[in-house]
Curated annotation (Swiss-Prot):
Skewed-composition ranges (Basic and acidic residues): 85-116
Source species: Pyricularia oryzae (strain 70-15 / ATCC MYA-4617 / FGSC 8958) (Rice blast fungus)
Gene name tied to this protein: slp2
Source lineage: Eukaryota, Fungi, Dikarya, Ascomycota, Pezizomycotina
Keywords: Repeat, Signal, Virulence
Domain of life: Eukaryota
Disruption phenotype: Does not affect the virulence and the proliferation of the fungus in plant tissue.
UniProt biased composition (Gly residues): 117-139
Protein name: Secreted LysM effector slp2
Misc. remarks from the entry: In plants, chitin acts as a microbe-associated molecular pattern (MAMP) that is recognized by lysin motif (LysM)-containing plant cell surface-localized pattern recognition receptors (PRRs) that activate a plethora of downstream immune responses.
């Protein structure tokens, strides 16, 4: 069924056309066909109803609006991207400043990483101080301090002898010397101290003030040693440790100075000798 507007137009054209002009119209599959010998028909323009055109206009506006919205979003996204890049660049500059110098300005910038950098710098100083503290302490003496200026010894402290103590072991604990302790306590035989005995121990001794030899005398006269008791003329030049052995005892037994035995056993812990352990004995050249 053709729209009413089309039918009306055809009726008007038929009334206005000359009698000699014949027009035939017929419907073929729902289309209007004009014969070839017929006069050219007037150009027909289909008028759309206002109701039908309104949705199309609105759709067009909606499409434009959507495009505009997309463009706006794209613009905003571009601006946001630029802003993000700018933010990253500034953040990078701030981090660089903090990392290089712990810059106070970097701290004002509120950069958390900058703050941590400052703390780390302080921590580094603390670490250096800690190293300094260790340097000031006796190498083996724990809390013992002394000889920081290579001239002044540490204080004299009291120590109550416990099972396993020897003067040699106490020298390592308190950065002292065997003969320094012996002289301070009038000990005739440095190899003999009693459990429960209270000793006065000079601590933190400077290297040049440590004395481990002057009070050690050979218990026997050994013709196999030199005059000073620093070496053996003939062997054996090794010894297998037995339970209860110590460098002091071995030195006295052989007519040697303890330090002479210590010197030929680098890396051996003389305070923790183990049974069946082999040590060296000094050989005269």
């Amino acid at each position: 069924m053709l729209p009413i507007t089309v039918v009306t137009l055809f009726a008007a054209l038929a009334a206005a056309a000359p009698a000699s002009v014949s027009m035939e119209k017929r419907r073929v599959e729902g289309e209007l066909v004009v014969r070839a010998d017929a006069a050219p028909p007037a150009v027909l323009t289909e008028l759309s109803s206002p109701v039908a055109s309104a949705p199309a206009a609105e759709a067009s506006k909606a499409g434009d609006a959507a495009k505009a919205g997309d463009a706006a979003k794209a613009g905003d996204a571009a601006k946001a991207g630029d802003a993000a890049k700018g933010g990253d660049a500034k953040g990078g500059d701030a981090k660089g400043g903090d990392a290089k110098g712990g810059d106070a300005k970097g701290g004002k910038g509120g950069d958390a990483k900058g703050g941590k950098g400052g703390d780390a710098a302080k921590g580094g100083k603390g670490g250096d101080a800690a190293k300094g503290g260790k340097g000031g302490d006796a190498a083996k003496g724990g809390n013992v301090r002394g000889c920081a200026d290579l001239k002044t010894n540490g204080p004299v402290v009291e120590h109550k002898v416990v099972q396993g103590d020897t003067l040699g072991k106490l020298t390592a604990t308190f950065q002292s010397g065997i003969c320094n302790i012996a002289k301070e306590n009038n000990i005739a035989d440095p190899d003999k101290i009693d459990v429960g005995q209270v000793l006065k121990i000079p601590t933190g001794l400077c290297t040049q003030n440590v004395d481990n030899n002057s009070c050690i005398k050979a218990a026997v006269v050994n013709p196999n040693t030199d005059e000073k008791g620093t070496c053996l003329k003939t062997g054996p030049f090794t010894r297998v440790i037995k339970k209860g052995d110590s460098f002091v005892g071995i030195a006295k037994e052989l007519g040697l100075q303890e330090q002479a035995v210590v010197d030929v056993n680098p890396g051996v812990d003389r305070f923790n000798l183990l049974p069946e352990q082999t040590i060296n004995l000094p050989k005269c050249k």
